[in-house]
């Protein structure tokens, strides 16, 4: 009885929390066309691969990614593949 009452009262919260946890666990590659657009920018600006805020907004609109995803991609790309010259 108590269990049913609690489930009825908090089922909305529980399902929102469950979906939030599932989102956070989801990892994977970015879409191929988005990666391609980011790599094009990277290859063009390899000597100084720090996009401006305007570049990031344009890339986000072009790729359909969040600005945070764009930012993280560049951070990771520089860390893994860039040797300042």
Swiss-Prot record:
Any Pfam family matching the protein: Homeobox_KN
InterPro entries, per the entry: ELK_dom, HD, Homeobox_CS, Homeodomain-like_sf, KN_HD, TALE_homeobox
PANTHER family on file: HOMEOBOX PROTEIN TRANSCRIPTION FACTORS (PTHR11850)
Domain ELK: 1-21
Presence of the UniProt keyword S-adenosyl-L-methionine in the record: no
Function description: Probably binds to the DNA sequence 5'-TGAC-3'.
SMART domains xrefs: ELK (SM01188), HOX (SM00389)
DNA-binding region listed in the record: 22-85
Family: Belongs to the TALE/KNOX homeobox family.
One Gene Ontology cellular component annotation held by this UniProt entry: nucleus
CDD domains on file: homeodomain
Cellular localisation: Nucleus
Alphabetical UniProt keywords: DNA-binding, Homeobox, Nucleus
GO MF: DNA binding; DNA-binding transcription factor activity, RNA polymerase II-specific
Name of the protein described by the UniProt record: Homeobox protein knotted-1-like 5
Tissue expression pattern: Strongly expressed in ear inflorescence primordia and shoot meristem. Weakly expressed in embryos. Absent from leaves.
Predominant location: nucleus
